Amino acid sequence: MKKQVLSVMMAALVLTAAAQNKKGDKLVGVGIGSISYTNSDSKTSYSNTPTVYKSDGNSFSISLNPNVAWFVQDNLAIGGGVSISFYNSKSNSSNTSSSATTESKYNQPSFYIGPLARYYFGSSEKGSPFVQANFQIGISGGKSTSTSSGGSSSETKTKPKGDWNGGVTFGYEHFITPNVGLFGSIGANYGKSKTTYEYRPSTGTGYDYTSEYSRFYIPVNVGLQVHILGKGKK
């Protein structure tokens, strides 16, 4: 009798695991793109002057990538995702020819949103490889300030005028329970950005300038994914 009960429980577990990528189920998760902290100092000298320029500072950055999607057919989920990141830095600079020092601060939050499609290859109870395509439009704006010990200061604000990226990601998800998985992925993305900067000094006349650039990068993610059974499923 005990063997029969155990067999039924094992069969139910396998069926649940195999059903987590079925049509009507939901996919909810979050990935950690990167976390970094840097502490640095530097000295720069030139051949045409005895002055030595010094600087020291630190920076911190973090990015998160939550997502939600619905399985429109077995193993294929369609939905959307966001990428949220924050960068903060602070530095101090001086030189040996002057007693003046300058403190600089920079804050840059970023927010991207867009659609995604993920396809799982198979539905093993242990895990599944997957491929994901995504496209996102970005909204990011930051501010930097510079203050000297002599009393002068300046502020620069950034305003995005067009920022987007798209790409393909390949990964593997390992199921730690029938409905919860840990995943790792690596991809290839391409994007373009256009940003306007507003420079405003405490004295003198300010000005605006615009920069445009394109980028190719390789995103690496690890995170947690939850598979929620569709309505009426147990």
Range-by-range predicted roles:
Residues 30-34, 64-72, 82-84, 115-119, ...:
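Residues on the lipid-exposed face of transmembrane beta-strands in outer-membrane beta-barrel proteins
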Residues 24, 58-62, 107-113, 127, ...:
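Residues that define the transmembrane beta-barrel architecture of outer-membrane proteins
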Residues 47-120, 124:
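Glycine- and aromatic-enriched membrane insertion/assembly motifs of diderm outer-membrane
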Residues 41-43, 87-91, 174-234:
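Predominantly the C-terminal beta-signal and adjacent terminal strand-loop region
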Residues 1-23, 232:
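Bacterial Sec-dependent N-terminal signal peptides
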Residues 23, 73, 122-126, 175-177, ...:
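Outer-membrane beta-barrel channels and translocator barrels
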Residues 20-70, 78, 221-234:
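Short glycine/proline- and aromatic-enriched beta-strand/turn motifs that initiate or cap beta-hairpins
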Residues 39-50, 90-101, 113, 141-155, ...:
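Outer-membrane beta-barrel translocator domains and adjoining extracellular loop/strand segments
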